[in-house]
Each structure stands twice: as structure tokens, then as C-alpha cells.
Swiss-Prot record:
Residues 144-157 have a biased composition (Basic residues). Detected in adult brain. GO terms for cellular component: endoplasmic reticulum membrane; mitochondrion. Participates in the regulation of cellular Ca(2+) homeostasis, at least partly, by modulating the filling state of the endoplasmic reticulum Ca(2+) store. In neurons and glial cells, has a role in maintaining neuronal function and integrity during aging. It comes from Drosophila melanogaster. The keyword Transmembrane applies. Glycans are attached at residues 694, 769. Residues 169-179 have a biased composition (Acidic residues). The chain crosses the membrane at residues 238-258, 259-279, 285-305, 347-367, 373-393, 446-466, 473-493, 513-533, 545-565, 572-592. This is Wolframin. Its main location: membrane.
Length: 853
């Protein structure tokens, strides 16, 4: 017991003091306070146990150190930094560290101060919301987070001082009881997942690591609830709740596009890539690469937009932990980690963007829907710009993003292709050169003008973005803004080949996709009105228009009343569909039962023949015969003429001749070669029947026209009965050889010698349909390139590019042509395509300062 003692008077008055005769009561009080969660008391007890200031009779010395470590771990979890330092010292010395607590000590020491503070805030939050229960509901947590977020927005908007902010915070209830279970709807109970303290502590750890807490999947913080419009009929959701409708549509579209790689299995993706590698030719490869890179760009952009929406949720979590934590909460560091952890879609985007720019000049314009691509890229440009303008927590948009976008538009806009700007808006004519241009090297031009000045101002703006927040603005502002500028470049490139009607068509198509349900609902409402008015047979046009407007207004009002009524809103959609389909059938049925005459709307378009080609760039037959054919034929020593004529290889020619012989010179089948050389027999037989067809089915003939048709069929029937083999001949790639006699017999008679020479035309697989219909004696006009001209060959060889029938027996023969780049080898052609793509990429990045021609 404590008693008062008084010292003897010595002339100086001293303080009275307590004499604690029983210190066990004080130790019990300390233990009780420490068990209640006081970090300072836990630290003091641990320090006294380590210093042997407290001797507990029931514990040995080793167990006493172990208990001190347990107190230090508890104090460290509660945010006591001195306890962390002492715990680290104990771990290094091995004092109190056992096999049971070593893992827990390591995890505690591995945590950052911010993570420990966040975990402490999570425990306090759960204790506040649970009121002693073992769990809380997502609705409680969501309501608390929304309340704190709205309060922080009001504080930022009003810019109040701390005292007023704290007074406002005191008005908010800190703790709230659990919901009354009987009042909760059964459907909500089934879909709701209860949250325990372990869930919140795990969420705090994920938050500190810059990862979205898994608990966030059960919450709807920055987006409306997906079921918020389920009580409204489908056709009336945009009419009654337009903002929620478009918001839900936006987020559902993002989720759909983002989930595409997860929906398509990996085996299917690999099979598609293998098929593309097999079937893609040199001209198909750029087309496939373009659309593949464009799809990756769209997917990566949607993934970025999804990350931006998640970042808003992450900031709400920051506000939650800041409101319940202390000064050790590292909200800025956690947010920067979250942005860095989600940089992978940006890498995919820029790689696909570079590939898209490289292959764009290699793709034929006929294979690209420029107007649709312009609308899509333009929409993504403005969406990404609007999202990046509000990357910070400020209410006003980021002025630097707007200025940078405007400067890029002024610098990259194709003024020379816009008639309105070039003829009327002379004050925007930035193409006037103010400095002289300089030619640097082969095909590189350095020029300075007003657009160049704007272009040089762009890096300054980008550096200003990157310098924000101690260079954290690189991934907060700069990289998202570069995505906007990339889509702007795609929009400008595709808009140069688009048309006004094409852009209108694409815009209406995009609007139709977004507004399909509302438009269909309006049509379903108005079709019965049109049928009813049409059945009345009103003669007066004014009466007809007035009755139509009145009936439409009544129908719309009546349908809205039925949609708002709870008793009828479940059946209004089905009733509307049935009525619309019935009335549409009544309108269409008379026209379907009538007979129509199909008249051609368009005449056959005339085709330009080979006669329209210029002969200035080609080698005429008379000159070739005089230089090569005649000397090689007449001179006994042909070496000199052969060497000279070999220099003509690659020169284009346009000649006319008579067909003498047509045959197949070469057959290639990549699939058959792979199966025959690299696969076992049983697997090869299976793949031949899977990808090919039966020989008897492949062989087709007409007994009336072919006398040996029946004999061939019997042979194949017997062969199939014995082996059951299949063929892959439909995968064959043929090269044809046409022997054509070129020359003029009339001039030969006058000169006393013949000027005709046999020329071999080597035709590509694409000429198969044309060559099969040729007959001996047909006169053709062909365009091609000389190949191995009179060198190591008996006849002149020409690689066929275009052939036109002049006098042929078959009436189906016209003109056949292939478009191929003249190059020394396929590898040279691919290198030329690659150089064109790289020049286009460099022009997109450096033009107009440096131009690669």
C-alpha cells in the first residue's frame, strides 16, 4: 500500500512522494495497458525485459527475451519506430529470436514505415466500423470511403484552414453500427462478400506496395453500380438517366475490350499467328501487321483508361488511410508506385504505334477504311486528352496539356490539303518559309519555317510536364500525354485519305453503335404510329403531319408512364418489341409479295489496256531484235552479244506475240513439304485429310467433253479403296511457262530473213485462271521484265507482270495483272519496304524540321 511520509524539517520544504511498497500492481497495470494496444507501453515493457529491470518469476531468461521481442513486434505493428530499431538490434544479436517468431520478425522488419502505418490505420478503421463484430459489409466501407472522399473534395474546393477542416470532420460520425440484417435485400446478401480485419490489413499492404487492394473488387467507388439501372427498361435508360447510362456504357466497353486477351485462349492465339505466318505473303504481311498493331493500340489505350479509373479508386483509399493513420502514411509514394506498376500497357502501346507507322505506307489504300480509322483515332485522342487533363487532384483542367495539344495540332495539321485553310484562312498559313532550306545527304532536307518553330516548342512543353513532382511527372503526365499525341498522329495520317461522306458515315455508325438501344426504342415506338396513320388514308398533308405529331407525342408520353410504373415496367419492353415487329411486318409484307425487275445500276467500267502505257520507258521489240536476237542468232561467236544483252536484265518490255505452248514449270507446296519431311506418316495422313480433300473429290471432269473421264474415275476409286489417301493439291503454288513467238513476219519477208523469236514468259501463280484458257495461236500483248536475256538460256525469258488477250479463241479471256515491286530479290524488296516505313516514322517524328524523302 502507498503511505504518506514526511521528512524532518530542515528549513527547506521538499515535495511529498509516494512510497510504493507493492510494485506488482504497477507491473500488472502496465501489462494491461500494453495488451490494450498502447505502443509506447509495449516498447517500455520490452525494453525493461531486455534490460532485466523486470524479473518475472515464471519466465526464464530466454523466455523473457522472447516475450520482449513479442512486445516489440506488437509495438512495431502499431507504428512505433523506436520499437522497430530495437527489434532490428535484437534480430541482429539473436536476442529473443526463436524458430517460432523469426518469420514474423522478418516480415515486420521488411515492412516500410508507411506499410506499418497503413496496417495500423486499417485495424483502427475496422475497430471503428465493426463495433466489436467479426466483420463489416462492403456497403459500410464504401459509404465511409465516399464520405471521406467528398469531405476532402469540399476542403480542397473551399481551401479552408486546418481548424475549420477539423471542425467539419467532427460533425461526421466516426463509427456506425452494422446494418439491420432483416432489412437487407436477399439478392444483395447473396452477392455481398463480408470483410474481415484480415482483409483490410491485406488491403493496407497492397496499398503500400502500389497495388490495388483486392477488397476494391467488391466496391463501386468511382463508377456507378452496374445494377443501378436494372429497374429501368432497356429502351428508356438513356432517356431517364442519360449520365449514368453513358458512364456505364463507357466502363462496360472498357472492361469488354480489356478482357479480350483473357477470353481468347493462348492456344487459339498461337494457332492464329502460325496460320498468318503460313498464309501471309509479302503484300499481306504489312496489312496483317497494321491491323494487329492497331488492335494492340486500342487494347492498350483501353487498359490505360481502366488504370486511370482505378487510380481514382486508389486515391480514395489514400484518403481513407490518411484519415485514420498518422504522419507515416506515404500516400504520394504509394500513388507513384501504383502508376509505375501499371506502365506495361504504355510499353505495348508505343511498340505497336511504331510498328503501325512503319507498315502504314506499305499497305494499299484500298485495304484501309480511312474514314472509320479517322473517327476512331479522333475519338480516342479526345478521350485520352480529357482523362490526362485531370490526372492531378485539382478541379481545373491541366493548362499545360491543353497548350501542348494545341501546339501539336498547329504544327502537324496538313494545311496544304485543307482547301478552306489554304484559300480563306491566310492568317493560319504556317507554310511560308522564313529561312532557307538545306539539303543534307541523299534524300534528307533541313528546313526552317513557322511550323518548325512550333515543332521546336513541343519538347519544351514535354520537359515542363516531366519536371513536375520531382520528375515523377514522367509517368504521371508525360507518358499519358504522349499517348494522346500518338493518336493525334494516327488521326492526321488517316484523315488525309478520308472523304467527307466517309467521315459522316463513320460518325453515324459510331453514334449508332452507342445509341443503338435508344434509337431502336424510338423506332419501335414510332413504327406503329406510322402504320396507323398510313391506314387512315388522310388526303390533306397538313392533317397528316399534325395527326402524326400528335400520335407520336401521345405514344411517347404513354410509354414513359408505363415505364415508370412498377407494375408495368417489367412488360413494357417485350410489349414494345412485339408491337414493333408486328407493325414492321405489316409494312414490309406488301413489298415482299410483289415482283421486281432487277435492273443493273452500274455499267461495266472500261479498263485501260496495255496500249495506254508509255513506250518511252520500255524496250521495243525491233530494237531488242536488232541488238540481241539477231546477233546471237547469226554470229558464230555469241559471247560478246550475250554479255552485252545480259546488261538488259530488269528492263521492262511491252511486246506482242502468238502463243505456241503453255505448261507448268514449277510446283511448290509448303504444307506438303512440312508434313512429308518433319512429321510421321500416320500424323501426316491425318493432316492431309484434315486440311486437304480426297483425290476422287479433287479430280473433276465431264464425260461428255473428256473421253477418258470414266477411266480416270475408276483408277482413283481403286486407288482410294486401297490407301484412302488425300491430297493437298489445293495448297499448291504454280509457276507457268508460256512459249510465245514474237516478231513481225511481214518485215521479215521484205528483208529476206525472219525477225520472229521464241520468248519464254514466266508467269506467277496468280495468272493460273488466264493461262488455263489459252490455246495455241492466241495473240497476246504482254508487259514484263527481261530475265536472263540470252545468257545461259536458249530463249529470251521475261517475268510476266500483265497480259492482255488480243485475238483469242476463248471469249472469257481479257486482262490479267499482278502488282509487284521490281527488285533484285525478295529480300531487297522487303528491305525497301522497311526503309519506306522507317522514313515515314522519322518524318512523323521529325517533320517539318528534317524531311526524309
Amino acid at each position: 500500500m502507498a503511505t504518506w511520509t514526511q521528512n524532518e524539517p530542515t528549513g527547506v520544504t521538499k515535495r511529498r512522494r509516494w512510497n510504493l511498497e507493492d510494485r506488482a500492481s504497477l507491473n500488472k497495470l502496465k501489462h494491461h495497458i500494453a495488451e490494450e494496444g498502447c505502443p509506447q507501453m509495449q516498447y517500455d515493457l520490452a525494453k525493461e525485459l531486455l534490460d532485466n529491470s523486470i524479473v518475472e518469476p515464471n519466465l526464464a531468461k530466454g523466455n523473457q527475451s522472447q516475450k520482449a521481442v513479442n512486445w516489440l513486434v506488437s509495438a512495431a505493428h502499431n507504428g512505433h519506430e523506436d520499437a522497430v530499431k530495437l527489434l532490428r538490434q535484437c534480430y541482429n544479436d539473436g536476442s529473443g529470436i526463436t524458430a517460432e517468431n523469426t518469420d514474423e520478425v522478418r516480415r515486420c522488419l521488411a515492412m516500410t514505415p508507411g506499410e506499418r502505418a497503413a496496417r495500423k490505420a486499417a485495424r483502427e478503421l475496422f475497430a471503428c466500423l465493426s463495433n466489436g463484430n467479426e466483420h463489416i459489409t462492403p456497403k459500410q466501407l464504401e459509404r465511409k470511403m465516399r464520405r471521406i472522399y467528398n469531405l476532402q473534395r469540399k476542403r480542397r474546393r473551399r481551401d479552408d484552414d486546418r481548424s475549420s477542416s477539423s471542425s467539419e470532420g467532427e460533425q461526421e460520425p466516426e463509427c456506425e453500427p452494422l446494418e439491420d440484417v432483416p432489412t437487407i435485400d436477399l439478392a444483395n446478401v447473396e452477392r455481398r462478400r463480408l470483410i474481415t480485419e484480415a482483409h483490410l490489413v491485406s488491403a493496407a499492404s497492397n496499398y503500400s506496395a502500389g497495388q490495388m487492394p483486392s477488397v476494391n473488387d467488391a466496391l463501386t467507388l468511382s463508377v456507378p453500380d452496374p445494377r443501378s439501372l436494372d429497374h429501368v427498361p432497356c429502351f428508356y435508360r438513356m432517356i431517364f438517366h442519360p449520365l449514368i447510362f453513358f458512364t456505364l456504357f463507357y466502363h462496360r466497353l472498357l472492361n469488354l475490350i480489356v478482357s479480350i486477351p483473357n477470353v481468347i485462349p493462348l492456344s487459339v492465339r498461337c494457332s492464329v499467328l502460325v496460320a498468318i505466318s503460313w498464309w501471309s505473303s509479302r503484300h499481306m504481311l504489312p496489312l496483317v501487321s497494321y491491323y494487329l498493331s492497331l488492335g494492340i493500340m486500342i487494347w492498350a489505350t483501353c487498359k490505360m483508361l481502366k488504370t486511370k479509373q482505378q487510380f481514382v479508386d486508389f486515391r480514395i483509399w489514400s484518403g481513407l488511410f490518411l484519415s485514420y493513420g498518422d504522419q507515416n502514411i506515404e500516400a504520394d509514394i504509394a500513388e507513384h508506385r501504383f502508376l509505375r506498376n501499371n506502365m506495361k500497357p504504355y510499353l505495348y502501346f508505343f511498340c505497336a504505334f511504331i510498328c503501325n507507322l512503319i507498315v502504314y505506307p506499305l499497305v494499299t489504300d484500298a485495304w484501309l477504311p480511312h474514314s472509320e480509322l479517322t473517327i476512331i483515332s479522333g475519338a480516342l485522342t479526345f478521350i485520352t486528352m480529357c482523362v490526362s487533363m485531370y490526372a492531378s487532384s485539382h478541379q481545373l483542367p491541366d493548362w499545360l496539356v491543353i497548350v501542348s495539344f494545341a501546339v501539336n495540332v498547329l504544327a502537324k495539321y496538313p494545311y496544304e490539303m485543307d482547301e478552306v485553310v489554304s484559300t480563306r484562312w491566310r492568317f493560319l498559313d504556317l507554310r511560308v518559309p522564313t529561312f532557307s532550306s538545306f539539303v543534307i545527304g541523299n534524300g534528307i532536307e533541313f528546313c526552317l519555317n513557322c511550323r518548325t518553330a512550333l515543332y521546336l516548342f513541343i519538347p519544351v512543353l514535354l520537359i515542363m510536364m516531366a519536371k513536375r513532382s520531382r520528375w515523377h511527372g514522367v509517368y504521371t503526365f508525360l507518358i499519358p500525354h504522349c499517348v494522346t499525341l500518338s493518336w493525334l498522329q494516327v488521326c492526321i495520317a488517316t484523315s488525309q485519305s478520308s472523304t467527307v461522306f466517309g467521315v459522316m458515315r463513320a460518325a453515324l455508325g459510331l453514334a449508332g453503335i452507342v445509341l443503338f438501344l435508344p434509337l431502336f426504342g424510338i423506332v419501335a415506338l414510332l413504327v406503329p404510329v406510322f402504320v396507323a396513320i398510313d391506314s387512315l388514308g388522310l388526303a390533306s398533308e397538313q392533317l397528316r403531319w399534325g395527326s402524326t405529331a400528335l400520335a407520336c407525342g401521345l405514344v411517347v408520353v404513354l410509354s414513359c408512364i408505363l415505364a415508370l410504373n412498377r407494375a408495368t415496367q417489367k412488360y413494357i419492353t417485350m410489349l414494345q418489341l412485339i408491337t414493333a415487329i408486328t407493325t414492321a411486318c405489316l409494312l414490309v409484307l406488301p413489298y415482299m409479295t410483289s415482283s421486281f425487275k432487277d435492273t443493273p445500276r452500274f455499267n461495266a467500267m472500261p479498263r485501260a489496256g496495255l496500249h495506254s502505257l508509255s513506250e518511252t520507258n520500255t524496250l521495243p521489240w525491233d530494237r531488242f531484235h536488232a541488238l540481241c536476237a539477231q546477233p546471237v542468232h547469226e554470229q558464230p561467236n555469241k559471247i560478246k552479244a550475250q554479255l552485252r544483252c545480259s546488261l538488259l536484265n530488269g528492263m521492262p518490255v511491252i511486246w506482242e506475240g502468238s502463243v505456241t505452248k503453255v505448261e507448268i514449270s514449277r510446283v511448290s507446296n509448303f504444307l506438303e513439304d512440312t508434313i512429308a519431311n518433319y512429321l510421321p506418316v500416320w500424323l501426316g495422313r491425318m493432316l492431309r485429310c484434315l486440311h486437304g480433300e480426297n483425290i476422287s473429290q479433287h479430280f473433276k471432269c465431264d464425260p461428255k467433253l473428256d473421253a477418258q473421264c470414266e477411266e480416270w474415275r475408276s483408277v482413283f476409286k481403286t486407288f482410294n479403296a486401297q490407301s484412302g489417301s488425300c491430297t493437298l493439291q489445293r495448297w499448291n503454288r504454280y509457276e507457268y511457262e508460256l512459249l510465245v513467238k514474237v516478231g513481225t513476219k511481214r518485215s521479215g519477208r521484205l528483208l529476206g530473213r525472219s525477225t520472229t523469236t521464241d520468248v519464254i514468259l514466266r508467269a506467277h501463280h496468280d495468272f493460273g485462271n488466264f493461262t488455263r484458257l489459252l490455246s495455241e495461236g492466241d495473240v497476246v500483248l504482254f508487259y514484263g521484265i527481261l530475265h536472263n536475256s540470252r545468257l545461259l538460256a536458249d530463249n529470251v525469258q521475261v517475268k510476266l507482270k500483265t497480259i492482255e488477250c488480243v485475238e483469242c479463241r476463248s471469249r472469257d479471256l481479257g486482262t490479267a495483272s499482278i502488282e509487284r515491286v521490281v527488285a533484285a530479290s525478295p529480300m531487297d524488296a522487303r528491305l525497301q519496304d522497311l526503309m519506306r516505313g522507317i522514313k515515314y516514322l522519322l518524318n512523323a517524328l521529325l517533320n517539318p524540321l528534317i524531311t526524309f524523302k
